[in-house]
């Protein structure tokens, strides 16, 4: 397969995601209308050259080089299609901050896969890109909705094939995400969890997930409230989030049906009626700032289109 011309640029828009939504640990996630944009430009040079330009203070600690997640994902595509690796520059408009539980690493993986596939003439289909994304990330709950959009339930069948179900999200369900200035790595959040679970906790989560999905489908707030309870990961992660319990209470007092940890945290996700969205966001911001934590809380819509790429005119 031929190498694209030097200077060829593709632009990839990748949405933020919120994962788990309480009981859907490592299988349920939703894309939200907050995007990272990646401009991937072909450079002169060999496979070890990857330059990274972040247009945000949030990502000032991120570095280029061959070990960068965007480039590692791109190389997976090129290996699959038998194409020689390309030197790249990535210019990133970063709206989804890293280490906040909003799927920032998933945006990097998906951007690398989609951008590299575009430069390879879209040689791989979406199902293969999904498989690669899950393999790189290690779990599907962020990368799948980031790639496909919407609310996605993903499970590995007995055949080892990944199965994705696009679930309904009623228009009367508003998501509010509070993003604090503090960080929490996914690795630290996973280390806090027990190595084994007990049967009653597993049964409880199965029931909660069923109620939650039905509540999201129908817009029934009572079902959402009952369905957002988790016993597998949240009890062990709340203590890691400074002021998190107070923020959750503030969201509920302002009219939220439920408030859970977004992904591994520390961002929090509240679900509420649309007319309560602004009040819930303001309550969450105020509560966290009373704890000394700068916070940005946003009412966000479900992003149903997933990631998109386009060529940038030269």
Swiss-Prot record:
Predominant cellular place of this UniProt entry's protein: cytoplasm
Metabolic or biological pathway: Amino-acid biosynthesis; L-threonine biosynthesis; L-threonine from L-aspartate: step 4/5
EC number: 2.7.1.39
Cysteine disulfide links: none
GO MF entries: ATP binding; homoserine kinase activity
PROSITE patterns cross-referenced by the UniProt entry: GHMP_KINASES_ATP
Record has Protease as a keyword: no
Keywords: Amino-acid biosynthesis, ATP-binding, Cytoplasm, Kinase, Nucleotide-binding, Threonine biosynthesis, Transferase
Family in the record: Belongs to the GHMP kinase family. Homoserine kinase subfamily.
Name of this protein: Homoserine kinase
Organism for this UniProt entry: Synechococcus sp. (strain RCC307)
Gene name as annotated: thrB
């Amino acid at each position: 397969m031929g190498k694209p011309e030097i200077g060829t640029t593709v632009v990839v828009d990748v949405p933020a995601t919120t994962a788990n939504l309480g009981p859907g640990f490592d299988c349920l996630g939703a894309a939200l209308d907050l995007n990272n944009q990646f401009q991937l430009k072909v450079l002169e040079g060999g496979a070890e050259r990857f330059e990274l330009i972040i247009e945000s203070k949030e990502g000032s600690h991120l570095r280029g080089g061959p070990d960068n997640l965007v480039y590692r994902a791109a190389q997976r595509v090129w290996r699959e299609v038998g194409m020689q690796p390309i030197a790249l520059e990535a210019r990133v408009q970063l709206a989804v901050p890293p280490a906040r539980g909003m799927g920032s690493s998933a945006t990097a993986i998906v951007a690398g896969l989609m951008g590299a596939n575009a430069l390879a003439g879209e040689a791989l289909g979406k199902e293969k890109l999904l498989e690669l994304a899950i393999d790189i990330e290690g779990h599907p709950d962020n990368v799948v909705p980031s790639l496909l959009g919407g609310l996605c339930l993903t499970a590995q069948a007995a055949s080892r094939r990944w199965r994705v179900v696009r679930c309904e999200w009623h228009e009367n369900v508003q998501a509010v995400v509070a993003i604090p200035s503090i960080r929490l790595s996914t690795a630290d959040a996973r280390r806090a969890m027990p190595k084994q679970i007990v049967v009653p906790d597993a049964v409880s989560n199965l029931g909660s997930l069923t109620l939650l999905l039905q509540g999201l489908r129908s817009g029934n707030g009572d079902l959402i409230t009952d369905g957002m309870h988790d016993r597998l990961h949240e009890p062990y992660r709340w203590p890691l989030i400074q002021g998190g319990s107070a923020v959750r209470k503030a969201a509920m007092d302002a009219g939220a049906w439920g408030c859970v940890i977004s992904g591994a945290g520390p961002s929090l996700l509240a679900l509420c009626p649309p007319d309560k969205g602004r009040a819930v966001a303001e309550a969450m911001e105020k509560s966290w700032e009373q704890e000394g934590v700068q916070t940005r809380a946003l009412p966000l819509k479900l992003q149903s289109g997933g990631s998109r790429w386009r060529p940038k005119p030269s």
